[in-house]
Regions:
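Catalytic-core signal marking the mid-to-C-terminal active-site face
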Residues: 1-4, 12, 17-24, 343-463
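Hydrophobic alpha-helical bundle architecture
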Residues: 278, 282-384
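Glycine-rich, N-terminal phosphate-binding loop and its surrounding beta-alpha-beta segment
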Residues: 23-90
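Helix-rich catalytic cores of soluble enzyme domains
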Residues: 94-321, 325
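N-terminal glycine-rich anion-binding loops that anchor highly charged ligand groups
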Residues: 1, 13-26, 33-35, 73-76, ...
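Short juxta-domain linker segments that transition from a proline/glycine-rich
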Residues: 74-78, 98, 107, 349, ...
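Short acidic (Asp/Glu) and glycine-rich catalytic loops that position anionic groups and cofactors
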Residues: 26-31, 177, 215, 258-261, ...
Length: 463
């Protein structure tokens, strides 16, 4: 598959809608003909070599700093849904209030390490101005690293400028606090909007997540080895371009590979074929020594049900087993990414907590071998009251916020609530208890002045 990726780049090539990018690749040794760039085997891989295998992202306080790459795993909420849903309101278009709510829920959760980007599309705001309110929400209501806009170079630059206002221009030049989520226009096309945004973030020494989005049978061949080779080729070209712009800039090699129902054209998630492809891409990205984006709680289900749990669980677990470092879409995803659900969001948060515990591995030491507990309990007794149990019971096992392990009688007395109903109560409780983190008044005023100035400079556009 790695050799086939080189074959794709050499024989088929990649279409790039940007003259500067084509010039950079030509100077680096690519064969450029019009918009088409072709690469000798190994060239793109060599150009990726300056990208760091791991890097830090910095939050507004040190407790929110994270490492991307190496043995670290970063959970990131859903990205891009235009709709939201909850038990009372059903499925509806998202608003800026919903966006702010999900930023707050993310801030409150110890299992979301990153504030995300377009957690949902606030369609009540003009298309050309909503990015300002989204970036402000990340900066104001969270302390965690986040993603900025990539839907135009102007919006990317606005996102970077707002980060500079908050963190300082000199600080931003040496500290990664913001990323751009760059999607390849599969198959094998880098469009002008994405390349412009990629260049903006790379020049600022901020991160990019380069992600081919490939449905087998639509944007790529139907067979998984071909999809893996295509995804690797596309992502490597994006990483290589960032390194030609600014060597050493922090990047994540992302993949979004899944199958589709070949009778209806609908995307499918958690399928064995997609999971096998994820395992393969994980091994190939390790050979490149780059951080990997994969996995997520993905599902085609419209509600929080058994299908949602099964598909989400399979996709997430496989991504983690494949070695994913950056897990976008880790909370809230429903309906193939069209919807972010409040109940699904907190349900996924709970699962991320469980996965985080599993990823810590098995510690073997004197305490966990518990020789004193065996001595105290002896044969034929139980361990409930021994000193070792008393000393370890609070941390011995992961305690779910949502799972019900009471008796049938107690569950009935408590209202016979199912998972979705318990999750509904949980997200409301979390928002009721949210308190915004401290924020400097002068920074807040400067951000608002910047937003007001940008909004006043252009008429509202809804397309």
């Amino acid at each position: 598959m790695e050799e086939h990726s080189d074959w794709i780049l050499d024989e088929i090539g990649v279409e790039i809608h940007d003259g500067e990018a084509l010039d950079l690749f030509r100077q680096a040794g690519a064969r450029v003909d019009g918009r088409q760039a072709r690469f000798e085997p190994g060239l793109v891989r060599a150009l990726c070599a300056t990208a760091p295998p791991a890097f830090q992202m910095f939050g507004r306080n040190s407790a929110s700093d994270i490492t991307v790459g190496g043995d670290s795993v970063v959970f990131v909420p859903a990205y891009g849904p235009p709709f939201v849903s909850d038990l009372e309101g059903g499925r509806r278009y998202a608003t800026i209030v919903d966006f702010e709510n999900f930023v707050k829920l993310t801030q409150l959760s110890p299992w979301m390490h990153h504030s995300g980007g377009t957690i949902c599309e606030p369609v009540d705001l003009p298309v050309n101005k909503r990015h300002l309110d989204m970036v402000y929400a990340h900066l104001r209501y969270s302390t965690k690293p986040f993603m900025g806009s990539v839907t135009s170079v102007e919006r990317a630059e606005d996102s970077l400028q707002m980060a500079r206002i908050c963190y300082g221009t000199d600080y931003l030049d040496n500290h990664c606090v913001i990323q751009g989520n760059i999607n390849v226009n599969s198959p094998l096309v880098f469009d002008r909007v994405m390349v412009d945004s990629l260049k903006a973030y790379a020049r600022a020494n901020q991160g990019c997540v380069i992600s081919p989005f490939i449905l087998g049978g639509a944007m790529g061949p139907v067979t998984q080895p071909a999809l893996v080779a295509q995804a690797l080729a596309e992502a490597m070209v994006g990483i290589a371009l960032t390194q030609l712009i600014r060597p050493g800039s922090p990047m994540v090699l992302g993949v979004f590979l899944t199958t589709m129902n070949l009778r209806t054209g609908a995307p499918t998630f958690g399928t064995p074929e997609a999971n096998l492809a994820t395992y393969a891409i994980g091994q190939l990205v390790r050979r490149l020594n780059l951080p990997l984006r994969a996995g997520g709680h993905l599902t085609s289900s419209k509600v929080l049900d058994a299908q949602a749990a099964q598909e989400s669980g399979d996709t997430m677990l496989v991504g983690l087993q494949a070695g994913a470092n950056f897990v976008l879409q880790a909370a809230g995803w429903l309906e193939g990414g069209l919807v972010i659900g409040y109940e699904k969001f907190v349900f996924d948060l709970d699962r991320c907590g469980s996965h985080s515990r599993m990823l810590t591995g098995l510690l073997v030491d004197d305490n966990t071998l518990a020789a004193d507990a065996f001595r105290e309990a002896g044969a034929g007794s139980n361990f409930l009251g021994v000193s070792h149990t008393m000393a370890n019971f609070e941390t011995a096992n992961y305690q779910s916020d949502l799972a019900d392990d009471t008796s049938f009688e107690q569950w009935s007395a408590d209202g016979s609530l199912d998972s979705a109903q318990r999750a509904n109560l949980r997200w409301k409780e979390m928002l009721a208890n949210y308190h915004p983190p401290p924020f400097e008044q002068d920074v807040d005023e400067e951000l608002r002045d910047f937003m007001d100035s940008k909004k006043a400079s252009d008429e509202d556009r809804w397309y």
